[in-house]
Amino acid sequence: MNKFFYSLSLLLFFFLCEELRADTVITEIRTEQLVAPVGIDAPAPRLSWQITSTERNVMQTGYHILVSSSPEKLNKNEGDLWDSGKVQSEDSQWVPYAGKQLKSNMRCYWKVKSYTTAGETPWSTSSMWTMGLLSENRWKGVWIGMDKAFEWDSETQWSRLSARYLRKEFMVGKPVKQATIHIAGLGLYELFINGQRVGEQVLAPVPTDYRKTILYNSFDVTSLLTQNKNAIGVTLGNGRFYTMRQNYKPYKIANFGYPKMRLNLIVEYEDGSSETIASDLSWKLTADGPIRSNNEYDGEEYDARKEMDGWNKIGYDDASWLPVQRVSVPTGTLRASMTPNMKVVDRITPVAIHKIGEKYILDMGQNMAGWIRMKIKGAAGDSIRLRFAELLQPDGELYMDNLRDARVTDTYICRGIEKETTWAPRFVYHGFRYVEVTGYPSPELTDFTGEVVSDEM
């Protein structure tokens, strides 16, 4: 009988231990404080995690990290890149990778478990990171663009420069294992593969002092490629590279040149081979598209009559487009953007609308940074204008004095065939609560949405 109770007690002890293990777990897995980042250029990325427990005063006393070159190896607990073994340490933030030397474009898979005052945790869920291109000599191709303005542009104080559209078609002839694209688009860019927009980021890349640093973004685009012909499309906006004020206080406002791009798409095949589709002189460019002007101070002008249906898909006729130019290399060092991107984080409906003369004033109910997305109504050639302000004057008009010479006006010119179409600017943002609407037929609150923009932190 005593042996029976002894065995029962032992089983109960192990059961309680397992319950404890299940109640103390690893969460918030981060690499360089980012969630599964694609494209980092830290040679020894720093790893972080948190311990979550239902018990109080549970403290870490050690950790064990595994980093593998494939998910399969990680699932087998094979840390072929780094097996830290048990490390006696309370550290769970900014723990530097200390394994084999990492290479450009390498994918790394990792997990961690902790030893605590309450026992050993289970392994964390798996995470990963992808290395960027670790130096500029790892990039193929050249910087491309067009170092001139066009006849419809204006380089006066209130500069107007249309967006540049670039495209290239290429063939993928074998089954793809994985594909990663690295892009530096100055001043701002939107990226498309086979007509699909890549990523949720807006106003990318993060602005820098371009004399010192140029940032690039990286994306896993494996699922967007087909084993056949493919197309890459890139739209370049001005951002703060081609500055908002030309030939105006040059001692204060630096201008860095016309928009330009460098891009590497690295395709790795199932048979172990790889190839890089790079920005080179085989690309085509036009600036005669719908974004006629984009200026952070003055707003964006979009002429839908200039839309180029299917320009970022295979088979588009680009015979009228220009060959790109090889343009000068920016002076700043090309680095991975290891910071959360800007994105639309909230959407709000205006709380009121009232008419003043032939105009309408929208009240968003709060100050916000971002833009208005609106439903399109109108005949071909109709012009809809949105002007932005943070305050109203006593007579209900916008208060604009604090904006000095900024025009803060987004303009949409109708194509006339829009049905259930919405539009928002791509390459500008505004700080505002009130919006003056001109040229919009019978506006209602539900015709407009405020898209609030912030970083992903």
Predicted regions: what is each one?
Residues 1-25:
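Bacterial Sec-dependent N-terminal signal peptides
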Residues 24-107, 111-457:
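Extracellular/oxidizing-compartment recognition motifs
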